[in-house]
């Protein structure tokens, strides 16, 4: 049995929705145990609520538990072309895992959300830097998801990982195509994890 963690941060719910689609795809793979968790919120509750943050039911992960998984699929919104501060704060607490090599050889993949032109690909590839320092095997999705070839309308999705275009005010929710790419990413990573660890 390969253990897959879908680990995310979501302020307004876009990445939360994508995380559930990633997990749905991963659960299609026989021999994959899939768990969804989120990183802790770093904003004071009153500021989070005032900013319109969405309450989420996923349990909160601890940095130490990352070593328990065979694959980790990280989801983060874009903040100035990088991962969110909450995800950065969480990953900055993994120094002990780095020192012991606890994540070495584990699969790592990333999905993201952003406004149009907000840096979705840069967010994914800059997150890969942290995964590389841990010795994780980085898993992009390439162009195997056919939705990536549809240019008839605005949508997220890259060869690096699933994305959604949230729009400047956050009103645009993930489209069915974007969710399909996210499901593909989950299924693809889980399939590799089972082959390597199942």
Curated annotation (Swiss-Prot):
NCBIfam families: flav_wrbA (TIGR01755), PRK03767.1 (NF002999). Residues 4-189 form the Flavodoxin-like domain. It comes from the Bacteria. This is NAD(P)H dehydrogenase (quinone). HAMAP family: NQOR. GO terms for cellular component: membrane. Belongs to the WrbA family. One of its GO terms (molecular function) is NADP binding. FMN binds at residues 10-15, 78-80, 113-118, 133. Substrate binds at residue 98. Its cofactor is FMN. Disulfide bonds: none annotated. It catalyses: a quinone + NADH + H(+) = a quinol + NAD(+); a quinone + NADPH + H(+) = a quinol + NADP(+). Keywords: Flavoprotein, FMN, NAD, NADP, Nucleotide-binding, Oxidoreductase. NAD(+) binds at residue 12. The keyword Transmembrane does not apply. Its EC number is 1.6.5.2. Binds 1 FMN per monomer. InterPro entries: Flavodoxin/NO_synth (IPR008254), Flavoprotein-like_sf (IPR029039), Flavoprotein_WrbA-like (IPR010089), FMN_Rdtase-like_dom (IPR005025), NQO (IPR037513).
């Amino acid at each position: 049995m390969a253990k897959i963690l879908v680990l995310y941060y979501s302020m307004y719910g876009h990445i939360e929705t994508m995380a559930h689609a990633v997990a749905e795809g991963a659960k299609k793979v026989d021999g994959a145990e899939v768990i969804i968790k989120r990183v802790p919120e770093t904003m004071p509750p009153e500021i989070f609520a005032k900013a319109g943050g969405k309450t989420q039911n996923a349990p909160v992960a601890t940095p130490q538990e990352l070593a328990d998984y065979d694959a980790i699929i990280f989801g983060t919104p874009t903040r100035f072309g990088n991962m969110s501060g909450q995800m950065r704060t969480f990953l900055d607490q993994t120094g002990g895992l780095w020192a012991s090599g606890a994540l070495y050889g584990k699969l790592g993949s990333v999905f993201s959300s952003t406004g149009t032109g907000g840096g979705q690909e840069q967010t994914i590839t800059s997150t890969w830097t942290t995964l590389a320092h841990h010795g994780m095997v980085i898993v992009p999705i390439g162009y195997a998801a056919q939705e990536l070839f549809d240019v008839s309308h605005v949508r997220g999705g890259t060869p690096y990982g699933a994305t959604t275009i949230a729009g400047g005010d956050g009103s645009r929710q993930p489209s069915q195509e974007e969710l399909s790419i996210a499901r593909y990413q989950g299924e693809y990573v889980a399939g590799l994890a089972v082959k390597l660890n199942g």
